Amino acid sequence: SFLNNRLSGNIDFYVSNTSDLLMKRTVPIMNGYNSIMDNVGKTRNKGVEITLNSVNVETKDFRWGSTFNFALNRDKIVELRGDGNDDLTNKWFIGEPVKVHYDYNVMGTWQENDRFELNGHTIAWDAAQKKYLNEDGEEYQKGAAPGSAKLEDRDGDGKITAKDKMIIGSKLPSFTMSLGNTINYKDFTFSFLFNGVFGVTKEMQDYNFERWSLGYNYIDGMDYWTPENPTNEMTSPGYVPYDKHTFYKKMNYVQLKNITLGYNIPQSLLSKAGIAA
């Protein structure tokens, strides 16, 4: 503590290794089933947690104190089954966090008469076939039309397949912070808490137009694609995602988590009312 106990806190660093995790893993279907529960895998967590407490103002009748918290954690899969292979079914990848989004990368929205270069391939709209074709006449992205999500060809073969999926981001934040304040004035207490989450990748349900239904998503105010509004930010309302892919966004946000106002009734008033503490 410092400044006559007006400032205090602590810093914790940690490294945690966990092995023999009970997880469901896939096995060849020839066994009669395709998954079993097994003690497999190793993970490593490391991070830092910081807490600071301060007395900002203190007089006879007034006190204002604050508490600040910061937490950063990094986890990764060290080993799965001991063979060095990833588990695509469960979306587990060696060297990556346990909870990740694994999907196609959306580069934008297909436009009418679209034509672009990617990984040495030329992709263009064929009006006769109503398809986007590569230079060999192969369909680049099955079912794609103007207003569809434009997916990235990651492996460079000139067409979209399951091999083009990638790790989009972590489901857990890069770091979190919170700031709490408590103000006391005589018998009154007022407190509030802010929470902050930074660097988390979220699935954007608002972009999944095929799921629009009463009470779920609404199109009001959404800048969706139409021939008259050829936006590159959102697909058309009739778009059905290829291979059930979805949309993601890396987010940071701060929220007011809690507000409390309290009053401590003096014992003298309680006694007059016949109430004992």
Regions found by a protein language model. Name each.
Residues 57-62, 174-206, 268:
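Subset of outer-membrane beta-barrel
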Residues 38, 55-169:
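Conserved small-residue
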Residues 15-20, 28-30, 196-200, 207-211:
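Active/binding-pocket-proximal capping segment
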Residues 1-105, 246-277:
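Extracellular/periplasmic, surface-exposed regions of secreted and cell-surface proteins
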Residues 197-277:
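Extracytoplasmic gating/loop element in the C-terminal half of outer-membrane beta-barrel translocons
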Residues 108-109, 123, 180-182, 193, ...:
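Exposed, low-structure sequence patches enriched in small/polar residues
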Residues 40, 44, 86-101, 168-180, ...:
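C-terminal extracellular loops and terminal segments
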Residues 25-35, 155-162, 232-245:
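Flexible, solvent-exposed coil segments and beta strand-coil junctions
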